[in-house]
């Protein structure tokens, strides 16, 4: 389902969701970068030149022109990229699998830091009104974040349409503030010349190199452009960037620089200081609204990433709540929301100011960009069939830039940047253990089972006691291709329903599955059929709804009413064994067993959208 259409409505929507993070970077990026060095014209022009060319090369060229080509049938993001690699059956799948799940973990860590630094930096504008208000910055920011996370369960369907216009107001506001300063001191326009960036780095030496860690803050949020392709399409995102976001950001950065050339003492808060005093309070309100929207976009993106991971079988079936009946992409993941809330509040309370938060922010995003570069470079060779020379030249440049930023960000590891990285390793390990455990179950407990059709013959199926008028639907999980729930039912009961449907779902490596490819059916007996339902990794799995559509289209050889049928699911009870080694480590087996016990029964029923009052769980026992 490729999304190349363009409308101004989509462009406005993209402005509100895609550019919230990168659009609020002027609140803190220039202040953090220039802190600790002399505030003079040479240094300001050098830093502005680095900002200008970073936005042009990293965001405008690398992401919007090159990385955008690596979409998976219109969907972007690191997990969609992983699915694309799997779809092409590359021999390096295991490597990219590890890379992708680590990258997903990094994005979750970023989802903790972005709301913290964005909201705190906006509320710090209160200090421009009065020094006496500084002590209230952290409590107010914390209150805003508490409200933000507590309202996630309500969804954004009612107010989401306002995000685009509100962020547009934000961009227009910061652009006007920048223009007013540039008109007074147009000398800052010299920074467009890359000479000033090079001269600054040469003159500052090692100190100048480490200042790239601050420069990188202006491109954080650039990864959201690729991740949100599926929501708005490539062309609306490109339009919003080149005609609104990029010009407004540059005007504001250059405006801050122009003001600092003549008023270097205002480095304490250069963003708010370019506004006239009478506009401080309105600007604080606008900035706070913009940062809340930016935070909401990051939280929603994390929810979407989690849903992709669940559907691709990379993590357990944690509860996913649909918050809108009209838009399938509007979801709420309670457990992820709680983790993000705890992490965000911990960062706020531990670091207290945007300056301190900036010393931890960026390294996780930097690593994620580096991983995406590597995956897209391989896609360019193996899928796009680019020449090796062109790939080495182009992506060598990208990797060199990202590695340069990463080197400059390394000092952030010990000042708080280690938290999202350690979290990423932990999440990646959980995903790896879950995936490896499912593969072990499939290969050792289910793959060796005898074919159902043979078992039916051995049991003399037609001679079994029939339950006339009863229809039963047996749901089998992704690791079970043999119909385990049905076989266990036969063992426990020597009677069978009149109509039996064994349902297995498969999540394909594409975002959406066309109706013509949705169903596969195999008749095992006159009244026993096996149905495979295909879903895309961006779709919501709803077994009853899919079955109802199949009945309406007369796909099944027998008639039954989905609203009265009984559903059967198999719940494996996994036990770890010290004597028998299945996974790499005993504690890894314990982790997998814990996840299976806590994310199987009720969550399977919720995941498949099965009716609780007509669903029976059948237990089975597996020793690893």
Curated annotation (Swiss-Prot):
Q: Quote the subcellular location field of this record.
A: Cell inner membrane
Domain of life here?
Bacteria
Keyword Cell inner membrane among UniProt keywords? yes
| Annotated membrane topology | Multi-pass membrane protein
Gene Ontology cellular component annotations, sorted alphabetically: plasma membrane
- Residue spans crossing the bilayer: 10-30, 48-68, 94-114, 133-153, 159-179, 210-230, 242-262, 270-290, 331-351, 363-383, 388-408, 413-433
| Record carries keyword Cell membrane | yes
Its UniProt entry gives the catalysed reaction(s) as: K(+)(in) + H(+)(in) = K(+)(out) + H(+)(out)
Keywords annotated in UniProt = Cell inner membrane, Cell membrane, Ion transport, Membrane, Potassium, Potassium transport, Symport, Transmembrane, Transmembrane helix, Transport
Disulfide links within the chain: none
* A GO term for molecular function: symporter activity
Q: What does this protein do?
A: Transport of potassium into the cell. Likely operates as a K(+):H(+) symporter.
> Which family does the similarity line name?
Belongs to the HAK/KUP transporter (TC 2.A.72) family.
List the PANTHER family hit by this protein, alphabetically.
Answer: LOW AFFINITY POTASSIUM TRANSPORT SYSTEM PROTEIN KUP, OSMOTIC STRESS POTASSIUM TRANSPORTER
Q: What is this protein called?
A: Probable potassium transport system protein Kup 1
Please state the gene responsible for encoding this protein.
kup1
């Amino acid at each position: 389902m490729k999304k190349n259409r363009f409308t101004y409505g989509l462009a406005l929507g993209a402005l509100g969701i895609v550019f919230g993070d990168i659009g609020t970077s002027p609140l803190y990026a220039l202040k953090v970068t220039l802190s600790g060095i002399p505030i003079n014209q040479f240094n300001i022009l050098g830093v502005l030149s680095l900002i200008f060319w970073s936005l042009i090369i990293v965001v405008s060229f690398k992401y919007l022109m090159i990385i955008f080509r690596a979409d998976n049938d219109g969907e972007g993001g690191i997990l969609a990229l992983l699915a694309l690699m799997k779809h092409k059956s590359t021999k390096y799948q295991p490597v990219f699998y590890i890379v992708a799940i680590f990258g997903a973990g990094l994005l979750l860590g970023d989802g903790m830091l972005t709301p913290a630094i964005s909201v705190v930096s906006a509320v710090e504008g209160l200090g421009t009104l009065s020094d006496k208000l500084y002590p209230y910055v952290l409590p107010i920011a914390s209150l805003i974040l508490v409200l933000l996370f507590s309202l996630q369960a309500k969804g954004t369907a009612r107010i989401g349409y306002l995000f685009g216009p509100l962020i547009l107001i934000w961009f227009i506001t910061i652009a006007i503030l920048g223009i007013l300063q540039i008109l007074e001191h147009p000398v800052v326009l010299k920074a467009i010349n890359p000479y000033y960036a090079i001269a600054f780095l040469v003159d500052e030496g090692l100190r100048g190199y480490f200042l790239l860690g601050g420069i990188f803050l202006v491109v954080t949020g650039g990864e959201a452009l690729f991740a949100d392709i599926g929501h708005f399409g490539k062309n609306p995102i490109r339009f919003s960037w080149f005609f609104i976001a990029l010009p407004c950001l540059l005007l504001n950065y250059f405006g801050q620089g122009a003001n600092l050339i003549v008023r270097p003492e205002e480095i304490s808060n250069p963003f708010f200081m370019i506004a006239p005093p009478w506009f401080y309070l309105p600007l604080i309100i606008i900035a706070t609204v913009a940062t809340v929207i930016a935070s909401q976009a990051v939280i929603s993106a994390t929810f979407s990433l989690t849903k992709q991971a669940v559907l691709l079988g990379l993590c357990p079936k944690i509860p996913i709540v649909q918050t809108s009946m009209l838009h399938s992409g509007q979801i709420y993941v309670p457990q992820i929301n709680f983790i993000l809330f705890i992490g965000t509040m911990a960062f706020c309370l531990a670091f207290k100011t945007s300056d301190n938060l900036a010393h931890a922010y960026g390294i996780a995003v930097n690593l994620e960009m580096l991983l995406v570069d590597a995956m897209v470079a391989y896609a360019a060779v193996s899928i796009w069939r680019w020449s090796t020379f062109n790939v080495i030249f182009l992506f060598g440049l990208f990797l060199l830039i990202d590695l340069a930023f990463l080197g400059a960000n390394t000092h952030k590891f010990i000042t708080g940047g280690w938290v999202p990285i350690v979290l990423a390793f932990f999440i990646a390990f959980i995903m790896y253990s879950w995936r490896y455990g499912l593969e072990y179950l499939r290969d050792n407990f289910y793959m060796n089972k005898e074919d159902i059709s043979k078992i039916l013959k051995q049991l003399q199926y037609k001679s079994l006691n029939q339950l006339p008028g009863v229809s039963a639907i047996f749901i089998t999980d992704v690791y079970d291709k043999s119909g385990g729930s049905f076989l266990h039912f036969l063992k426990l009961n020597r009677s069978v329903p009149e109509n039996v449907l064994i349902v297995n779902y498969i999540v394909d490596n594409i975002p959406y599955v066309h109706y013509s490819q949705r169903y596969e059916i195999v008749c095992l007996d006159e009244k026993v059929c096996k149905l495979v339902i295909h879903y895309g990794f961006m779709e919501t799995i709803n077994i009853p709804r899919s079955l109802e559509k199949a009945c309406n289209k007369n796909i099944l050889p027998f008639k039954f009413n989905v609203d009265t049928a009984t559903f059967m699911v198999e719940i494996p009870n996994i036990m770890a064994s010290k004597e028998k080694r299945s996974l790499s480590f005993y504690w890894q087996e314990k982790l997998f067993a814990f996840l299976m016990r806590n994310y199987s029964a009720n969550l399977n029923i919720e995941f498949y959208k099965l009716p609780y009052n007509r669903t029976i769980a059948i237990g089975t026992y597996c020793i690893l």
